[in-house]
Design a protein with these regions (language model features):
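Compositionally biased, low-complexity flexible segments
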Residues: 1-27
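Non-catalytic alpha-helical scaffolds and adjoining flexible linkers that form interface surfaces
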Residues: 29-277
């Protein structure tokens, strides 16, 4: 969805980024009792955690199934067939078996190793880490299809790896669009409370931009250019975003981070590592 507007409509050619689509394998196999036993999907590895001496629990955001937590058996062994493919930032095609508590990964093939370019640069790495954490918390419910969030994450990781735009801008664009897809798009061009034009302030707890009359206590006064930058990032206007100044980028990043932390219950811990100035 990196090349789509938050409401799913395609914008003009300006700023649109194509989404690379890989055909997934055959659909799920169904047991006699109607439950899925074996299924195939493509996904992005969000995080991993150790399990026992040789296994890992792998959390993925997948194209068709949504958020999936599955066990990769023996993937920590040096002779594992696909252990290296199940690392964070990797775009993989996986086959899984439905278990009683956690699914089990039986096959994994790399589609795009985004991590190779991302981990080589600190700014890209911290931005991508914040993206993965955000994706997991925004989707939240396991096995609830979230195609738009999946496509958005894939496009953001690809763009980050290409290095065309500053990592901070790519991160803020992803955060704004992810929130918009989840239903939390901030008001930018009009007052979040009365709908009036030419807002003067920004209040995270009020839903974004606010006018002078509706402005609540605790709101801040961003520069008009900062509102413009946020709108450009949300809408995919990269020429305008790339032309922004350091002052407005810093102000934008602060507002986006505050807005995100307000709407996600536990916040995003990895945002503290991101260079914001």
């Amino acid at each position: 969805l990196w090349g789509l507007s938050p409401r799913g409509r395609r914008p003009g050619r300006r700023g649109a980024l194509r989404v690379w689509v890989h055909p997934v394998g055959p659909g799920p196999r169904i047991r006699d009792n109607g439950k899925v036993s074996l299924y195939r999907d493509e996904g992005v590895v969000l995080r991993t955690q150790k399990l026992g001496e040789a296994d890992r629990i792998v959390t993925l955001l997948t194209r068709r199934t949504g958020l999936v937590r599955a066990v990769g058996k023996g993937v920590r062994r040096t002779k594992s067939r696909f252990g290296a493919r199940l690392e964070p930032f990797s775009h993989v095609d996986v086959q899984l078996y439905t278990g009683r508590t956690l699914d089990v990964i039986t096959q994994a093939e790399t589609l795009r190793p985004y991590g190779e370019r991302i981990v080589a640069d600190y700014a890209r790495y911290t931005a991508a880490t914040a993206m993965l954490e955000t994706a997991e918390k925004v989707v939240a419910v396991e096995k609830d299809p979230a195609l738009r969030q999946f496509l958005l994450l894939i496009g953001a990781l690809r763009t980050l790896g290409e290095g065309v735009h500053e990592p901070r801008l790519v991160l803020d664009a992803y955060l704004l669009r992810s929130l918009a897809v989840a239903g939390y798009a901030p008001a930018l061009g009009e007052c979040a409370r009365c709908g009036g034009a030419e807002p003067r302030g920004f209040a995270v707890h009020a839903g974004g931009a606010v006018c002078g009359v509706c402005r609540p206590h605790g709101s801040v006064n961003p520069a008009p250019e900062t509102f413009g930058l946020m709108a450009a990032l949300l809408g995919g206007d990269w020429p305008a975003a790339d032309a922004s100044t350091e002052r407005h980028r810093s102000e934008c990043s602060g507002l986006v981070a505050a807005y995100l932390q307000w709407h996600l219950e536990n916040g995003i811990r990895s945002l503290r590592l991101v260079e914001r100035s």
